[in-house]
Amino acid sequence: MNHTPNYSPKPEDFTPAHYDDDIHGIARPSRSYWQDAWRRLRANRRALVSLILIVGLLLFALIGPLLWQVDPSRQDIDQVSQAPGADRAASIVAPYEYWSGKSAPGFEGEGLRLAQEANSQAVRLLWDEVSSATSLRLYRNIFPIDEQLAFGLPIAEFASAGAGYYEDRLDLTPDTYYYSLVELDASGQSTGTFQSLAVEVKRVITIDEVRERQLVLDTTELNIGDEVLLALHPLGTDYLGRDILSRLMHGARVSLFIGFVAPMLYVLLGVAYGATAGFLGGKIDQVMMRFADFVVALPFLLFMILFQVVFGIGPGESGIIPLLVALIVLAWPATARLVRGQVLQIREEAYISASRLLGANSRYLVLRHMIPNTMGVILVTLTFAVPSAIFTEAFLSFIGMGVAPPTPSWGSMSNEGLATMLTHPHELIFPSVFISITVLAFNLLGDGLRDALDARMRDV
C-alpha cells in the first residue's frame, strides 16, 4: 500500500477561483419561428433562385412598361412576324407609281422573269407567250417547289396564254418567294408544265413613311437609295406586327393579376370556412365539410361557361371577371380542408385549454391562437395556388374563354403563335417560356416554403 506524504496547505490554496461571466453567456440570440424559417429558406438554393425569378417577373410586369413605352396594340406593318435580331434596315424609294407592264433596263430576258428589282412595295413579273397552253395560273409560295408540285397560293389566273405581266403587292415582307406560272388546258386543269422563279424581296420605305413614323428626326437630307433603321423590337413581332416584348409585359400584368388576386380571395374564404368548421366540430363540422365536398365535385369548365352567360360575356369579349368569380367560388375547398385539419389538432393543445380557463372567447381563440399557428400551411397553400391560377388563366385564354384579343395575355399569345409555329416559332416560344418559368418558380418556392415552415425542422 502506497503511503501519501502529509501535505501542508498554503495560504494561496484558499484563494477563491476566478468567475468568468462569458462562460455562462448566450452564444447567439434565440431565433424566432419566422427568423429560422427565413434562414432555412435562404439555404435552399432552388427556392431562393425561384424567389429571385418571381421578384424579377413582378418588376418585369410593373416597371417594364414604364421603361419600354411601346403600345402593345400598335402594328408595324413593315415588320410582320419579325424574328428577334433580324435586319431592320430599309432602303428609301420613291412613292408607288402605276406600272404599265414595261421592263426596266437590265431586266430583259425570256420566260417568267422580273420586270424590275423586287421590293416590299411590289414584285413585278413578266412572261412570254406560252403556245402549248390554253390559259395560265400564277402561284406564290414561301417554300421551294417540291416533287409533289405544291405551288402554294394561287394569286392570279389568265384566260389567254399570251405574253403578260402581273404586279404582286399582297403582304410582301423581306423574304424569298417562289413564283410558278402553271400551264392549263381547255378544262382548266394543269398540264404539268410550269415555269418557276425565286424572288428575293428587299424591304423599302418612302420618305413620307419615315416622316410619319418619326424614324429620323431630320428627313430633309434623305435621298432615294439611303438606308434607315425601322423601329426596334428586341423580341420580334407577331403576325400582326405588334411588339412581342411589350405584349409580354402587359400580358404579365393580366396573368399575375389573376394569379395573385384570385388565390388571395379564395384562400381567405377557405381559411375562414375551414377554421370555423374545425373549431365548432361535431355535426356542424360534418355538414360544412360535406358541402365542401359538393363544391369540389362541381365541373369548373361548365361553371366558367355559365358565369360567362350570367355576366353577358359574348364572343370576342374579355372573360376576366367570370374567371375570377369561377376560381373564387370553386377553388376554396382545398384550403378549407387543410386549415380544418390544423385547427382540429391545435384546439386540443394545452395552451388552448389554458386560454379557455382564463376566459378567452371563441373569436379570440381562433384569431389569436389557431389561425396564426396555421399560417405556415396557409402560406404554402397560397404559394401553390398562384401558379395553378396562372396556368388556368393561360389555358382558358388559349381556348378562347379567358382574356380576349386585343388585350394581351400569355395564354392568348400562345394561341396566336400556334398558327405560325412552323414558320415563325418565336411567336409561340416566348409566351410559353414565360408561362413555364412562372409556374415552375412558384412551385419550387412552395416546396421551399413548406420545408422552411415545418416546425419539426426548426433549430432551437
Language-model segments: residues:
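Transmembrane alpha-helices
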Residues: 253-267, 363-395, 442
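Transmembrane alpha-helix boundary and packing residues in multipass membrane permease domains
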Residues: 57, 275, 305-309, 327, ...
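Gly/Trp-centered helix-boundary motif
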Residues: 1-267, 271, 389, 406, ...
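Generic hydrophobic transmembrane alpha-helix motif, especially the helices
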Residues: 234-238, 242-244, 255-272, 278-345, ...
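Short juxtamembrane loops and helix-capping segments at transmembrane helix boundaries
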Residues: 298-305, 395-427
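Transmembrane helix boundary and interhelical loop/hinge segments in multi-pass membrane proteins
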Residues: 342-351, 449-456
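Hydrophobic alpha-helical interface/terminus motif in multipass membrane transporters
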Residues: 273-277, 307-311, 339, 352, ...
